[in-house]
Amino acid sequence: MAEVEEIYNLACPASPIYYQHDPIKTTQTSVIGAMNMLGMARYNRAKVLQASTSEVYGDPLVHPQTEDYWGHENPLGLRSCYDEGKRCAESLFMSYYREHGIPVKIVRIFNTYGPKMDINDGRVVSNFIVQALRNEPITIYGDGEQTRSFQYIDDLIEGMLRMMTATPDDFTGPVNIGNPNEFTISELAHIVLELTGSKSKIIRMPLPSDDPQQRKPDITLAHKMLGDWEPTIQLRDGLLK
């Protein structure tokens, strides 16, 4: 009997402040990490899931984003260590599937939040909540009209589990796992202020380079292949958790 039957390759910093701190290590984590997990899967004949990202779509020109969209991403920018590392990992997974017959699963994860997030994580949900609870200024980068789709962690986990257990071995994905309800960053800030009762003011800072202007998953394929999967926890309810 195999020592390992299923592998979930989840390792990589996903917050821009972390992955840009050491971009070489970030790329190595995605690429070498994928090779290590694929080698283990081949040795054990195990099924292996790659936690990819909506960042492979870059600053998309197609909206919402479907899995067959190749993306609009800057391969030389500050974010590319993360984006290109994940794209390379997807390529490695498909190469192992074609060459060695390893049952691989690729999911592209959209913005996810939940309890126990690091207060210094640097991503927008944790930033806004921490700032609001401290009555510090809420920092919006750019005009606040850029959009994101926020997914509660429980919905993500359910989607990944279904990808591993409810799809045939010859179905590799990729599959978008995300909440298709879209909010502007300004809307998110006002929701956080309302839910926390904070007296924080909103301030605006320059938008970082290559920051996507819109992000929203098309989850048609997930609904079809993952047993009618769709997010069940909406933004306000998730933020209260």
Report residues per predicted region.
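C-terminal substrate-binding subdomain of Rossmann-fold SDR/epimerase-dehydratase oxidoreductases
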Residues: N36, N111, A132-K241
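Conserved donor sugar-nucleotide recognition element shared by glycan-biosynthetic enzymes
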Residues: C81, A89, D121, I185, ...
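Acidic pyrophosphate-coordinating catalytic loop
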Residues: M117-D118, P212
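Short glycine-/acidic-enriched loop or helix-start segments at secondary-structure transitions
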Residues: Y18-Y19, D59-L61, K116, F150, ...
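Amphipathic alpha-helical segments in well-structured domains
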Residues: A34, V125-S126
